[in-house]
């Protein structure tokens, strides 16, 4: 589907290892979503979900059809069989304790570019 509700938002995900540089592991776009947000909202409500003003609706993993646009480490590392090489030479099949995951997004047209900033989190060991 390629309608006007499929927003053109560039997305980027990076992993920063402890005391190291970050590596961009995914560049995708929100327009790659199979269902747009209007369709996802309709799907929720038709199945009885009581959506109310202020509720947060999340899209889930956003993946493209090219390897650089895969949206999860399971896809990026091909179920752990193809590790990615980090800037220091170490490899990752999945995210490790101590890694920082960084996500960024921007949208633009011919006249203006809007940045959504970045969100990042440090992956802590399980208790």
Give the role of each language-model region:
Residues 1-127:
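Catalytic-pocket segment enriched in acidic/His residues
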């Amino acid at each position: 589907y390629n309608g006007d509700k499929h927003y053109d938002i560039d997305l980027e995900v990076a992993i920063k290892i402890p005391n190291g540089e970050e590596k961009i592991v995914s560049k995708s776009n929100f327009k790659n979503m199979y269902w747009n947000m209007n369709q996802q909202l309709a799907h929720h409500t038709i199945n009885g979900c009581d959506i109310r003003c202020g509720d947060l609706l999340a899209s889930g993993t956003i993946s493209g059809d090219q390897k650089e646009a895969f949206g999860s480490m399971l896809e990026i590392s091909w179920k752990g069989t193809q590790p990615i090489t980090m800037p220091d030479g170490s490899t990752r099949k999945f995210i490790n304790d101590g890694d920082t995951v960084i996500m960024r997004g921007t949208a633009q047209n011919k006249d203006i570019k809007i940045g959504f900033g970045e969100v990042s989190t440090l992956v802590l060991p399980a208790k």
